[in-house]
């Protein structure tokens, strides 16, 4: 990775828009908040004819330079990541994203990296307890029912956690990174048929 200037980021977002892309995804993790700020400035120009998703599960906390979360991003805000999938964590993450985006509009709110691929199996189990017993899922539902978001889901790197989530709640969509490809077809066995069944 290397430093990306604001004008280069805006030019890339504009090129995507000009090419016809109307779905933009971001997250607090990306650039430790900088990506949401930049996407927010772009969508202010684009208007309401797009779909925007961001993610919950990582809170960004101010910190000393020595405590910045070691990510691969370069020249980003001085923040450390705290994972939190509880009711308060989801609500705080949503509010913080709204502030960084400079807009009250988020269409899809995705649980970010809640799975064992990021946290190990014990961590995944803890995260699911936070989500379903600690109120994180209730927070997502409240936001959806209040019309503050249109859909809830998960942005993850393993399809197995998506199956678990579908077994526990009414999720609308999943952003599955690289787990269904020409070479990796396992999701076809149970996960994608379950998605079809659940509409």
Q: What annotation goes with each model-predicted range?
A:
Residues 1-62:
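N-terminal binding-site loop/beta-alpha segment at the start of enzyme catalytic domains
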Residues 3-16, 86-100, 157-164:
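Short, acidic/polar
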Residues 62-81, 117-125, 194-199:
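Glycine-rich, positively charged active-site loop/lid region within alpha/beta enzyme cores that binds
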Residues 22-23, 49-55, 105-110, 149-153, ...:
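Structural preference for beta-strand elements that scaffold enzyme active sites
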Residues 1-7, 75-91, 125-128:
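Active-site mouth loops of central-metabolism enzymes
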Residues 15-20, 96-105, 139-151, 198:
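A structural motif corresponding to the C-terminal end of an alpha-helix
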Residues 98-123:
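Active-site groove signature of glycoside hydrolases
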Residues 7-10, 29-32, 42, 114-199:
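Beta/alpha (TIM)-barrel catalytic core signal, keyed to glycine-rich beta->alpha loops juxtaposed to Asp/Glu
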């Amino acid at each position: 990775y290397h430093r990306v200037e604001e004008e280069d980021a805006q030019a890339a977002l504009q090129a995507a828009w000009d090419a016809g892309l109307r779905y933009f995804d971001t997250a607090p993790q990306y650039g430790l908040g900088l990506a949401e700020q930049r996407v927010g400035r772009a969508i202010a120009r684009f208007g309401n004819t797009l779909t925007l998703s961001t993610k919950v599960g990582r809170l960004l906390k101010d910190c000393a330079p020595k405590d910045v979360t070691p990510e691969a991003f370069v020249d980003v805000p001085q923040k450390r990541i705290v994972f939190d999938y509880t009711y308060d964590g989801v609500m705080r993450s949503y509010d913080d994203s709204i502030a960084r985006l400079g807009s009250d509009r988020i269409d899809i709110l995705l649980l970010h990296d809640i799975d064992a691929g990021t946290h190990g199996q014990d961590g995944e189990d803890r995260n699911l307890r936070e989500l379903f017993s600690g109120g994180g899922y209730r927070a997502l539902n409240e936001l959806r029912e209040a019309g503050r978001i249109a859909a809830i889901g998960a942005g993850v790197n393993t399809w197995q956690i998506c199956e678990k989530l579908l077994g526990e709640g009414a999720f609308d969509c999943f952003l599955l990174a690289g787990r269904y490809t020409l070479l990796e077809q396992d999701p076809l066995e149970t996960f994608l048929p379950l998605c079809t069944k659940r509409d």
